[in-house]
From Swiss-Prot:
GO BP of this protein: cysteine biosynthetic process; hydrogen sulfide biosynthetic process; sulfate assimilation
NCBIfam families: CysI, PRK13504.1
Name recorded for this polypeptide: Sulfite reductase [NADPH] hemoprotein beta-component
InterPro entries: CysI, NiRdtase/SiRdtase_haem-b_fer, Nit/Sulf_reduc_fer-like_dom_sf, NO2/SO3_Rdtase_4Fe4S_dom, NO2/SO3_Rdtase_4Fe4S_prot, NO2/SO3_Rdtase_4Fe4S_sf, NO2/SO3_Rdtase_FeS/sirohaem_BS
Cofactor annotation remark: Binds 1 siroheme per subunit.
Record: residues binding [4Fe-4S] cluster: 438, 444, 483, 487
High-level lineage: Bacteria, Bacillati, Bacillota, Bacilli, Bacillales
PROSITE patterns in UniProt: NIR_SIR
GO cellular component, one term: sulfite reductase complex (NADPH)
Length: 573
């Protein structure tokens, strides 16, 4: 007997991941967050509300360094909250920098984290300070809406210090895309900004997302050749700016990139975006919306481990995705235009832009802005912000560009750089300059191993090997994450470490220097000694046998150390 539509619908609903029900029943992301914030008996909120809180730009965390001791004392974990700002294109004014600095000093752990998606993160905010922190962020004309959660996340763009007029235009598109793809619910303003409450939520709608929002997070980034600093192939939607006669004419579109996977589950894998076509710049916002709705309608809502857009694209095929996109647009996107990437790192130090302005790219190891006894980075940047008349651009490599510096201000800012001993990184090895690490311990609940706190010291030991091999000047990308979620985009690095357990990592080799190719597992679950013992002969061979201009990632493939990865489906093979 044939099943009725109602029966089929009920059976389908039974298969959904539990979070799909939570979103559907959350009253458009309200849940009981407000009540949880008001509860003085715990530093936490409910498990369900922690999942909804992500859509508001915050994660509940605890200090994992203190877990065991607090458990022995029969105390609840040392709960705190991370807040992530929505900052399309990573551009902030000096006034906004000062506001972020104040928030970090007054409510967080006195540091700022510049993320791999070009925004600010605050760590260590106590529940009683969470709402005040949110208000202070909004008072600076920034917000945290959709910085996390199953929605479009912070839209990235190339912080190009060369062509200021092109950068301004693509940054505007990053902002337009971000604003257009925001959730429409009033929940954020009600909870954090004391906005007027919607009395009848049945009147509230999410015309683009619907009550369940997306199956998983969604990421968009804009690259501007020759720089692939945003790692365009790691994005769910990658936009590659096409400039003709010094005019931005449109974007090549890639679909289905993503870094995350699950250890031991070969059905999960990182993937590079595939070229879909070219679109005129005037249509790019609509194109992004239509692609997002394809993921909304076709994405996997039964298994969150296979819910990212990359799996949807792999399941349907790029041609089917393009066909569906053309149908939803009502017109056909064009064939991709020619372009070429040369690198995915930052251009450090002073660079002259057009119209007579200057830009200084400051090297900030792993994006952590803090003061230490011998390096007053946070204080120095505050002093610069107090006099700077241009803007600040957070780079996708966790560095900072002091941008649009007038000739009149350049000497004053250089004086502050000298006074505080700030560095553009040119005195470091190419390996350290091209390094990235996620936060991991002690705050990230997903971390299996150290990352930000460990990578700098590991690099120092690898640098000894580079010096021995005579390749310490070579630009080599190295990245580390404490878990396989891929926040520092490790699967695209020439050398990568993904945490498996405290002190143990999977080591991957052979990513593309331009961010165009995934790397390959070389050794599994190894500690520092084996890491160094494994790398030494490879680096020695690289020093002796590399071709002129050959990057390390290309060398390890040519020499047979690892096989070339052509796409996510053969990442584990």
């Amino acid at each position: 007997m044939a099943k009725t539509n109602k029966q089929m619908s009920e059976e389908l609903d039974k298969k959904l991941d539990a979070l799909e029900y939570l979103k559907d029943e959350s009253n458009y992301l309200r849940g009981t967050i407000e009540q949880g914030l008001a509860d003085p008996l715990t530093g936490a909120i409910s498990d369900d509300d922690t999942k909804l809180l992500k859509f508001h730009g915050s994660y509940q965390q605890d200090d994992r360094d203190l877990r065991d001791e607090r458990r022995k004392q029969k105390l609840e974990p040392a709960y705190s909250f991370m807040i992530r700002v929505r900052l399309p294109g990573g551009t902030a004014t000096p006034e906004q920098w000062l506001a972020m600095d104040d928030i970090s000093n007054n409510y967080a752990n006195q540091t700022l984290k510049l993320t791999t998606r070009q925004t600010f993160q605050f760590h260590g905010i106590l529940k009683r300070n969470l709402k005040t922190s949110m208000k202070k962020i909004n008072e600076s004309v920034l917000d945290t809406i959709a910085a996390c959660g199953d929605v479009n996340r912070n839209t990235m763009c190339n912080p190009n210090p060369y062509q200021s007029h092109i950068h301004k235009e693509i940054n505007n598109y990053a902002t337009k895309i971000s604003d257009h793809l925001l959730p429409k619910t009033n929940a954020y303003h009600e909870i954090w900004l004391d906005g007027e409450k919607v009395l009848d939520s049945s009147e509230e709608i999410e015309p683009m997302y619907g009550k369940k929002y997306l199956p998983r997070k969604f990421k968009i980034g804009i690259a501007l050749p020759p720089s692939n600093d945003i790692d365009v192939y790691s994005q769910d939607i990658g936009l590659i700016g096409i400039v003709e006669d010094e005019t931005l004419v449109g974007f090549n579109v890639t679909v289905g990139g993503g870094m995350g996977m699950t250890h031991g589950n070969t059905d999960t894998y990182p993937q590079v975006g595939r070229l879909a076509g070219f679109v005129p710049k005037e249509q790019v916002v609509d194109v992004c919306e239509k692609i997002l709705t394809i993921q909304r309608d076709y994405g996997n809502r039964e298994n969150r481990k296979n819910a990212r857009f990359k799996y949807t694209v792999d399941r349907l095929g790029v041609d089917k995705v393009v066909e569906e996109l053309n149908t939803r647009l009502g017109w056909e996107i064009e064939e991709p235009r020619d372009f070429e990437f040369e690198h995915n790192g930052d251009r450090l130090g002073w660079i002259e832009g057009d119209k007579g302005v200057w830009n200084y790219t400051l090297f900030i190891q792993n994006g952590r802005v803090k003061d230490t006894e011998d390096y007053q980075l946070k204080t120095a940047l505050r002093k610069i912000a107090e006099t700077h008349t241009g803007d600040f651009r957070l780079s996708p490599n966790q560095n900072l560009i002091i941008a649009n510096v007038t000739p009149e201000k350049k000497e004053e800012i250089q004086s502050l750089i000298d006074q505080y001993g700030l560095t553009d990184g040119k005195n470091y090895t190419g390996l350290r300059r091209n390094s990235m690490a996620c936060v991991a311990f002690p705050t990230c609940g997903l971390a299996m191993a150290e990352s930000e706190r460990y990578l700098p010291s590991l690099i120092s030991k690898i640098e000894d090997l580079l010096d021995e091999a005579g390749v310490d000047d070579e630009e080599i990308t190295i990245r580390m994450t404490g878990c396989p979620n891929g926040c520092a985009r490790p699967a695209l690095a020439e050398i990568a470490f993904i945490g498996k357990a405290p002190g143990k990592y999977n080591m991957y080799l052979g990513g593309g220097f331009k961010g165009e190719r995934l790397n390959k597992l070389y050794k599994e679950n190894i500690g520092e000694q084996e890491i160094l013992e494994s790398l030494r002969p490879i680096l020695m061979d690289y020093g002796k046998e590399r071709l002129e201009g050959e990057h390390f990632g290309d060398f390890v493939i040519r020499s047979g150390v690892v096989a070339k990865v052509h796409g996510g489906q053969d990442f584990h093979s």
